[in-house]
């Protein structure tokens, strides 16, 4: 039976309960660290494999830039390699937890769509209160 000052859902406060909770917390922290390590390894693997794919297919075509180069199929396209930018890394840079998305080179890359949007917004804000209309508003 509960007393007027306590709620029925409160567990009894004692040392064994505290030790049990402390043990569970340490187990969860260890599990989280293992999962984070595994995630970093997977993201790094995706980054390397994606770079290899983009490098091998830059002359002929790939899923990022299209396959027009495959239709042309001349010798210069087949010899050309590594013609891609960091913003072409659609898969590895889509993860917010990837260490590659937090790199300064990615943040300062002006070729990304986000950077272009940011520039346009800053430019439109500097036009003395003039508002730029879009096709959706018409």
Curated annotation (Swiss-Prot):
- Major subcellular location class: nucleus
- Keyword list, A-Z: Chromatin regulator, Coiled coil, DNA damage, DNA repair, Nucleus, Transcription, Transcription regulation
Positions of region (Disordered)? 93-138
Q: Does the keyword Signal apply?
A: no
GO BP, sorted A to Z:
DNA repair; DNA repair-dependent chromatin remodeling
Q: Enumerate the subcellular locations listed in this protein's record, separating them with semicolons.
A: Nucleus
What does the entry list under GO cellular component?
A: cytosol; Mst2 histone acetyltransferase complex; NuA4 histone acetyltransferase complex; nucleus
Coiled-coil residues are: 18-44
Biased composition, Basic residues: where in the chain? 129-138
Family under the similarity heading: Belongs to the EAF6 family.
Subunit structure, briefly? Component of the NuA4 histone acetyltransferase complex. Component of the mst2 complex composed of at least eaf6, mst2, nto1, pdp3, ptf1, ptf2 and tfg3.
Q: What does this protein do?
A: Component of the NuA4 histone acetyltransferase complex which is involved in transcriptional activation of selected genes principally by acetylation of nucleosomal histone H4 and H2A. The NuA4 complex is also involved in DNA repair. Component of the mst2 complex which is a highly specific H3 lysine 14 (H3K14) acetyltransferase that functions together with gcn5 to regulate global levels of H3K14 acetylation (H3K14ac), critical for DNA damage checkpoint activation.
> What is the protein named?
Chromatin modification-related protein eaf6
Per the UniProt record, the source organism is Schizosaccharomyces pombe (strain 972 / ATCC 24843)
Lineage, top ranks = Eukaryota, Fungi, Dikarya, Ascomycota, Taphrinomycotina
